[in-house]
Amino acid sequence: MPKGEGKVVSQNKKANHDYFIEETYEAGLVLQGTEIKSIRAGKVNLKDSFAKIERGEVFLHNMHVSPYEQGNRYNHDPLRTRKLLLHRKQISKLIGATKEEGYSLVPLKLYLKNGFAKVLIGIGKGKKKYDKREDLKKKDAKREIERAFRDRQKQF
C-alpha cells in the first residue's frame, strides 16, 4: 500500500491551510490498550497536535484521544505524549529538515493500516498571511470555473 492508504480515522485539515507540506513520512504509534480502542471508534483529534524530536526520537504532542468509555480505571491521559516509530535514517532526515529556520513536523492524518494505527507526518514550512489569502483566491477562482463549466454542460 502507498503512503496514507488505509481507513482514515482523523485528518488535520488546518495543516494544509497553515503549512506548505514538502515531504511526508508514515510513522507507527506507541499506544496503550484503551487508546487504540478509542482510535478505532474515531474519537481522536489532530487539530492542535505537533511532532517534536527529543533525544533522537520523535514524539507526538497534543493529539487528543478521548478516554475509552468502558476503560474504567485503566484509561489513559487524553493528551499524553506519544512516541512515533520511524527508521533511524528517516529520523536523521527529519532532524536535518527541522533544524532549518521555519520548518516543523506536522501530523497530517491518522489512519488504520493492517490493524495498526499509523500517522502521516509532514515537514512543513509555515505560510504567511498573504500566502493563505493567495490560496483562498485560487480556490475560489477554481470553484467559479467549475461552476461555470457545470452550468454550461447543463445547457447542452
Curated annotation (Swiss-Prot):
The keyword Cytoplasm applies. Keywords: Cytoplasm, RNA-binding. SUPFAM superfamilies: Small protein B (SmpB) (SSF74982). GO terms for cellular component: cytosol. It holds the Pfam family SmpB. Its main location: cytoplasm. It comes from the Bacteria. Gene3D superfamilies: 2.40.280.10. It is found in: Cytoplasm. Disulfide bonds: none annotated. GO terms for biological process: trans-translation. One of its GO terms (molecular function) is RNA binding. The keyword Cytoplasm applies. Coiled coil: none annotated. Belongs to the SmpB family. Required for rescue of stalled ribosomes mediated by trans-translation. Binds to transfer-messenger RNA (tmRNA), required for stable association of tmRNA with ribosomes. tmRNA and SmpB together mimic tRNA shape, replacing the anticodon stem-loop with SmpB. tmRNA is encoded by the ssrA gene; the 2 termini fold to resemble tRNA(Ala) and it encodes a 'tag peptide', a short internal open reading frame. During trans-translation Ala-aminoacylated tmRNA acts like a tRNA, entering the A-site of stalled ribosomes, displacing the stalled mRNA. This is SsrA-binding protein. It comes from Bacillus pumilus (strain SAFR-032).
